[in-house]
Amino acid sequence: MLIDGIGAIDASNTSDDHAVSIDALTAERIEVLRGPAVLLFGSQAIGGAVNVIDKRIPLRLPSESVHVDVLARSDTATDLREFGGSLDARLGNSGFVFHADGSWRETDDLEVAGFTVAPELRADLLADAAEEEEEGHLEEAEELREAADQRGFVPNTGTETWTANAGFAFFAGESSLGVSFGVYDSEYGIPGRPGGGHHHD
């Protein structure tokens, strides 16, 4: 994952259960790179790369003195509430451009039709429950049956994320110099495998 051609140096590089700290809502465009072009971004991109182009550091002088974008989105599967906006402003005729953007997103647990686990996994859970019951572990058997019969919502899949970014750039002819600062704060759940925590000696 890249941001403006630079690797997204975050916890997602160390573990698959960490989300990338990239907000697609306020991105200008997203590039999917494959083939020889990915070698420009180092050996870790051998399988391809995703380059998110944002506007935190303005890349060009805007044609308007002030430009504002506002976005909103919702869905019913997760009861998504999402808002975002960005501002680009030329500071007179000085060659300075200011940018600011922010977003907020919240979702509830994912709503699904039917059972929350796949048929094969549900069969395994019910078989494990029967085995636990035969061995006299009635509480564990009941927990496994509850996990197998769970339906409607996938537990621990809700999220809440907010971002805030600001940047300046100075343009002089064909040259430019810019700096930016951003905050990305996210709380998200990782659904566990039902029945994965039952072990006996």
Model-derived features with residue positions:
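Transmembrane beta-barrel outer-membrane domains
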Residues: 20, 43, 76-80, 155-161, ...
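Predominantly transmembrane beta-strands of Gram-negative outer membrane beta-barrel pores used
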Residues: 29-33, 49-57, 61-76, 81-147, ...
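Short acidic/polar hinge/loop motifs at secondary-structure boundaries
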Residues: 6-36, 40
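Flexible loop and strand-edge segments within Gram-negative outer membrane beta-barrel domains
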Residues: 155-161, 174-201
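Outer-membrane beta-barrel translocator domains and adjoining extracellular loop/strand segments
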Residues: 16, 63, 111-117, 184, ...
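Feature marks short, surface-exposed loop/turn motifs that line or immediately flank catalytic pockets
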Residues: 9, 106-108, 185-187
